[in-house]
Structure formats: structure tokens, C-alpha cells
Amino acid sequence: AIPETTPLFSLNHQKLEAYLCLKNKVADIMTQEAGIIRTENGLQEGLENLHHLEETEIFEENEYYSLVSKNLLTVAELIIRSALFRKESRGGHFRSDYPTPNDKYVCHIIQQKGKEIRTTPVIRKLKDKN
């Protein structure tokens, strides 16, 4: 006989609507505050808005759409925190309060939720002259 297994996640279809609503709110925050042109004030406001959403949403433990919603908020927060950390403009990251590149930020930014941001140097390979 095949043993019965307990599913890892429940699936509450009523949570789908809540997830889609949250997804739109997060998209609006990221577009307005962490879009193409960024400022420290806007990024801080975006972070506060994300925290407000996280505090007001009701998440069910081990429920699929609740997990996806939490992950969405976590990724958005990590994006904003790394943008706040980089006090420069480079490539697709433009801060109007720091409009020029700064070589201090030629690095890999490493972060985890709830931990300090740290960096590691970028190792550039020398081109072969042959």
C-alpha cells in the first residue's frame, strides 16, 4: 500500500484574491518609489509602505498564497534596501540624489532579511593580450 502523505501547503482559493490585490499594491509601491529615478526619501517611503502592508495583511501558516505573498514582500524589501545602500548611479540604478557612479559600489551586495548588508569585491579578469 502507498503511504498517505500530508501536503506541505494548503491551498485557500480565497487567498488568491488577497494575493493579487497585494501584488498590485507592491507593484505600485515599487513603480512609484523604486522605479527608474530613485531618491532616498522615496525609497524610505517605499520601505515604510511595504512594512505597513506586511503588518496589515493576514497570512495563514502553510498556505500557498500566503507564502507567495510573504516572498513578494521580502523580495521588494531587499530591492529597496540594496538601492538605499548604493549611494550612486550606475546602469539601471539611478539615484537623483547621487547622480554619478562611485567606485566604492563596484561590489557584490549580499543581504538577507533581518541581517546587515555586506559586500564582496568584484574580481575582474584581465583580458588576454594574445
Each PLM stretch: what is its role?
Residues A1-N130:
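Glycine- and aromatic-enriched mobile tails/lids
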